[in-house]
Amino acid sequence: VVRDAFAKLGHNAVSVDFLPSETEGKHIQGDVLDVIGSRQWDLMIAFPPCTHLAVSGARYFAEKRADGRQQEALAFVEALLTADIPKIAIENPVGIISTHIRKPDQIIQPWMFGEDASKKTCLWLKGLPPLMATTVIKKKRYANQTPSGQNKLAPSPDRWKIRSKTYQKIADAMATQWG
């Protein structure tokens, strides 16, 4: 979504992931740590997996620390943040990056960009300004919430992928403001 928003504005945008791209466009299927050192990049917007980092999985933190998964995830984020790229944004939900690496530079919500949704998202920035809200929608409850305020997406094999998707209007704001 983010790659496509930048490409739509004429940028030479490339996505990198172990998974294949779900849309047409420039995509490298592989390890981003191998790719970022392969050439000069001017901007990286990274979305590291939140599986071992987000507070939504806090009940499993002891197990993840004991077997090293959490330390490995933090080392990956640190490698992304310290990459030799002048402009970097790292996106992740509220989690342990804030306590183990550093606090986020900004916390955004989809409703700040015209989306009828709530999803507290942290941004760690290097060489980039905070995103400016575009169209703010304030509600007591958003379309993706239950009456108690929880995410209403039912459990499913691809729930992780659906919940991790970047909202289009946030991607558009990144492209117009950082591109």
Regions found by a protein language model. Give the residues of each.
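Conserved active-site and SAM-binding loop architecture
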Residues: 1-179
